[in-house]
Amino acid sequence: MIYHFTEEYDIIVIGAGHAGVEASLAASRMGCKVLLATINIEMLAFMPCNPSIGGSAKGIVVREVDALGGEMAKTIDKTYIQMKMLNTGKGPAVRALRAQADKELYSKEMRKTVENQENLTLRQTMIDEILVEDGKVVGVRTATHQEYAAKAVIVTTGTALRGEIIIGDLKYSSGPNHSLASINLADNLKELGLEIGRFKTGTPPRVKASSINYDVTEIQPGDEAPNHFSYTSRDEDYVKDQVPCWLTYTNGTSHEIIQNNLHRAPMFTGVVKGVGPRYCPSIEDKIVRFADKERHQLFLEPEGRNTEEVYVQGLSTSLPEDVQRDLVHSIKGLENAEMMRTGYAIEYDMVLPHQLRATLETKKISGLFTAGQTNGTSGYEEAAGQGIIAGINAALKIQGKPELILKRSDGYIGVMIDDLVTKGTIEPYRLLTSRAEYRLILRHDNADMRLTEMGREIGLVDDERWTRFEIKKNQFDNEMKRLDSIKLKPVKETNAKVEEMGFKPLTDAVTAKEFLRRPEVSYQDVVAFIGPAAEDLDDKIIELIETEIKYEGYISKAMDQVAKMKRMEEKRIPANIDWDDIDSIATEARQKFKLINPETIGQASRISGVNPADISILMVYLEGKNRSISKTLQKSK
């Protein structure tokens, strides 16, 4: 095939949502020449659904993206209108930050970053076709018949792939927020031999702030104590003048309106065929599935400082517009609310993720990567996490460097990608803390400790950031050593002070570290005995020290499990393995192995339907193969 390339790039990223911007920024910062193509340049890093970043598990992902050198955390720290630490009454493994965003300002701030990035070209154009020769990506073709050469292509199209918006009996071709749908590219991905699924998501109506009666709702303020997503943000820049959210509820009248109109609900009439998100169901789905519930929470979330639009979180729906209006007016505080936008469902094509490697490159086509909702996930944070990994690995592939694969013990991003490529997904995938078996070591307070060194090695962490990280790490290490070296003895003077502070007296000599391990003892209590550290420690380092010491036993057990799994991950499975050549494995295991083609014993062991006996047989088979290869090599000598 002869192509007429008018421009040449190392990497072309299709789609400028949260996955696309992270992918393009990472690759360009690693020295690649990148084109970021978007259907609508005004929607770069736009939030078509909830105006927030973070939340349970998701907030940790944002910090992981930041630790690797990504941009989401920095941008939300510049544009939030409220910041809140969730689950403060629970253990450290499930705590996470959540920010209400000024969604318009967030998009503008991210666009400024993209436009000013060296090696990165931003262009409004529709990509209709990915050009492939001999199983390798060579470029793309646009709707205006322009051909651009590329060594790698990253598809981050979100819900635009053959997108269709549904409101009642109205159904029309559209991407998110009524943008153009990408039809030809959806056809092209099928023609390239990729297996395609069909998912659905939805969004609630927006109401006018000045028409809400806030007096009958419950205020939900942000935190006064400073917190940030990015490790580069400063406490002195923390926004004090935050915008509150408000809590209200559905009621019996609301539920009756929905029940009386289920015959008009696309979810139940067969109009919606795509699979929806389990953990973010529509309000009509909730009313049917949880019929015993008298009410459901609804949060009224402002979409920014300079807009009247308020997002009604928890009221996602595709009911007809007249029913939505009645439903809104049945809710306390919204009796006279003006609906500014109608809620809708959107169906879209996605690439079944078992076809991907852990680098997010497709197994079928060399140089073709996918990330974000294209892979069947939901959420801006999940998209950003995949985007930065796809961008990094596309750049590393072009540069001939070793790939970056995050393990499940490295971060929630690693958990998510492993789940996708190993287990696949039959519904929009959402990250949850329960998905991570090592969640006690994958906390919000240690993402930089886990991943900054990786970011530095691949070239995404600059000298200033690295110096700050080294200072923090040294302060942490030095204080941990100090606490382990100083002893508190059960002498009269010490015990008098211990009892005065309300603690049980010492019976044996203990280190300061052991004393801090007591649940009721804080770091400041220990300092009262041993004096402060040589350097001033900020609250974040103190929090990290306390968590590491108080949960040391559990963390140690988790690290033992990580070591065992690492040994399994190091046992590679040949890419050309003949699964039919292995005797005695169960039929289901053989079928799953053929479908997913696991790359390591560890990955094979996590495939649903594969049992320990199948793994044992596989290991025996591989050991036999290795012995026979060794014998052949010895004979040839």
Curated annotation (Swiss-Prot):
Name of the gene this protein is made from: mnmG
Superkingdom to which the source organism belongs: Bacteria
Organism: Streptococcus pneumoniae (strain Hungary19A-6)
Name of this protein: tRNA uridine 5-carboxymethylaminomethyl modification enzyme MnmG
Location of the protein in the cell: Cytoplasm
InterPro entries for the chain: FAD/NAD-bd_sf, GIDA_C_N, MnmG, MnmG-rel, MnmG-rel_CS, MnmG_C, MnmG_C_subdom, MnmG_C_subdom_sf
Family: Belongs to the MnmG family.
Cofactor: FAD
PROSITE patterns: GIDA_1, GIDA_2
Cross-referenced SUPFAM superfamilies: FAD/NAD(P)-binding domain (SSF51905)
Biological role: NAD-binding protein involved in the addition of a carboxymethylaminomethyl (cmnm) group at the wobble position (U34) of certain tRNAs, forming tRNA-cmnm(5)s(2)U34.
Residues engaged in binding NAD(+): 276-290
GO MF term list: flavin adenine dinucleotide binding
Alphabetically ordered keywords of this record: Cytoplasm, FAD, Flavoprotein, NAD, tRNA processing
Keyword Signal: no
GO biological process, one term: tRNA wobble uridine modification
Binding site for FAD: G15, A16, G17, H18, A19, G20, I127, S182, Q373
